[in-house]
Design a protein with these regions (language model features):
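Asp-based, Mg2+/Mn2+-dependent phosphohydrolase catalytic module
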Residues: 1-6, 99-102, 116, 120-225
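N-terminal helical cap/lid subdomain that shapes the substrate entry/recognition surface
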Residues: 2-96, 103-104, 117, 125
Length: 225
């Protein structure tokens, strides 16, 4: 049974699988600099710490110095925007989970390291933007996860303490941020754990996927038209 009044979700690896689009953007960025493609499998292991870190990892993989990181990042952002999220997918059960939470008047928010400019368009593409009261991206504030300020900021806007909220994510950054905020948290194995043993990351609870989360919270299944 869910007792929290506010659920803060990570985005990539938690609500959506965006790696196919990210991989296209990374490979297009590398091609711009006449470098070989990284491929989807590599990109899947590199995500979770923001787009700048993703680009840095791609350059390191291509044995390039980070001197042109800013330029490469700009190329990546343009390439990612050009994908129009054509290959990203919601994880199964996400719309039903969000609808069930909204029916119980649970406030919902997103705290992600994804650049702010991409968040609302992708939520709109999947018709789930109406469920979220607050959306905080990786460049919206001066810091990003694992710094807990994203979570403090959302709680302040919601007018409630972190103890009334719960963080749901898929990475060490999510759990470190939640623990630093003294906020309850759940880690999902379905995401981009980067090959880690998720049970050892300090999460209060580790579940397989969105459906397991719905059952854990004893929420009814909703039919979404």
């Amino acid at each position: 049974m869910l007792e929290a009044k506010l659920v803060i979700f990570d985005l990539d690896g938690t609500l959506i699988d965006s790696v196919p689009d990210l991989a296209v953007a990374v490979d297009n960025m590398l091609a711009h600099f006449q470098l070989p493609p990284a491929g989807l499998d590599n990109v899947r292991h590199w995500v979770g710490n923001g787009s700048l870190k993703l680009v840095e990892r791609a350059l390191m993989h291509a044995q390039q110095h980070a001197d042109n990181l800013a330029a490469a990042h700009a190329v990546f952002l343009q390439a990612y925007g050009d994908t129009h999220h054509a290959y990203s997918r919601l994880y199964p059960g996400v719309p039903q989970l969000l609808a069930a939470l909204a029916e119980q008047d649970i406030k919902l928010a997103i705290a992600t390291n994804k650049p702010q400019q991409f968040i609302l368009p992708i939520l709109q593409a999947f018709k789930i933007e109406q469920y979220f009261d607050w959306i905080v991206g990786g460049d919206f504030l001066a810091v990003r996860k694992p710094d807990p300020y994203h979570l403090f900021y959302i709680c302040e806007k919601a007018g409630m303490p972190p103890t009334d909220a719960i963080m749901v994510g898929d990475s060490k950054a999510d759990i470190d941020a939640a623990n630093a905020a003294l906020m309850d948290n759940i880690l999902l194995r379905q995401g981009y754990g980067q090959g880690m043993d998720l049970s050892g990351l300090g999460a209060m609870l580790v579940l397989d996927d969105i459906e397991a989360l719905r059952k854990h919270w004893c929420l009814n299944t909703h039919t979404i038209e």
